[in-house]
Amino acid sequence: MTGGATGALPRTMKEGWIVYARSTTIQAQSECIDTGIAHVRDVVMPALQGMDGCIGVSLLVDRQSGRCIATSAWETAEAMHASREQVTPIRDRCAEMFGGTPAVEEWEIAAMHRDHRSAEGACVRATWVKVPADQVDQGIEYYKSSVLPQIEGLDGFCSASLLVDRTSGRAVSSATFDSFDAMERNRDQSNALKATSLREAGGEELDECEFELALAHLRVPELV
């Protein structure tokens, strides 16, 4: 999900509800990106939304590097795992349309917060980090109590999410903003926040990338 994206208003969270996500990263050919976006919108998204337990799909695109990330959200781990066989040919065809090969990861959606719906022109800053596997819970609580309120104060803030892989200690923090201009204006402030947060949480930055939010239709509840 990646990405902190929203295409619908939040639902009420069930007590103790844990939501999951599967992300597919494709290194696309630049001339195939628009065709790939249309394929996700017209073919992949309707197919996934018809599967039991799927509660949303988003697509992030970085035209400069060619990196594209499609993320599907699922009500339960069981629903996500049960969909694997159905999803595989859909994913492989999607990768062909983008002119690349898919790399798949599965996550727990540890946090999701929206200020308002995303609109055309919205962009996402995604930061991949790693913490010791035995400190994932502490990292999640630190994100919710300290990092998220500060992200929410950034210019143009729309929504934010945190995806975690408890086994590896890896996580993806994504923040959606109203426009690229807003994201550009808050970049220095975001970098300062990131440096402080990683130091205090004992985390390591693995990667960061800024994307256009090409598609978003998510019904993931507020998880804060």
UniProtKB/Swiss-Prot annotation:
InterPro entries recorded = ABM_dom, Dimeric_a/b-barrel
Name the GO terms of the biological process aspect.
cellular response to starvation
Q: Which residues cross the membrane?
A: none
Using the record for this protein, list the coiled-coil segments as residue ranges, or answer none: none
Q: Specify the signal sequence span.
A: none
Instruction: Please state which protein family the record places this protein in.
Output: To M.tuberculosis Rv2558.
Indicate what this protein is called per its UniProt record.
Uncharacterized protein Rv2557
